[in-house]
Amino acid sequence: EKGLSACGFSGEKHVLLMMGGSLGAVKLNDCLREILPELTKTFDIIHLCGKGNLDEALQNRTDYKQFEYVSEGLNDLFAAADFVVSRAGSNSISEFLALKKPSLLIPLSARASRGDQILNAASFEKQGFARVLDEDEMTAETMKKEIFALYENKEKYVVAMEKSPAGDGVAAVMTQIKALMR
């Protein structure tokens, strides 16, 4: 698989993809890096950390691959990931739903945004597609707890996404085309 190969991963461990948004997210990056030794016992980690947020001390690890930003090949990284930790922007979470990727969503707080990510995350949580962690309550320890809870229950989230008509864009488009042909 291209994503695994691009990261130098063997495919023997589950893969966690961490995305902090287009500019990264310092608090998310810091928490993830603090618990990295514990997480990498179980997971290989792809970390999209944002421009200027690479940690040079972590560059040559075989179980952790960091990128400032990815445009070419992002689809391969999504394909390689078993689950995702991310902000809750509408484009990203729509991708997670379409690809059936269980996610831990950490929306921007109301102080830092219009509140749309909070609503997006709440909707996904209510539908059983994701777990949500409030950034104001997030510590490295709560992030670790939530990541492992997501991992241990990932099938539950996949089943919920598979049952959702919102997750099957092709079927929705075909239904519309057939309706127009009548």
Spans of model-derived segments:
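A short, well-ordered alpha-helix in the C-terminal region of glycosyltransferases
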Residues: 5, 155-167
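Short, hydrophobic alpha-helical segments
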Residues: 147-155, 177-182
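C-terminal alpha-helical cap of glycosyltransferases
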Residues: 166-182
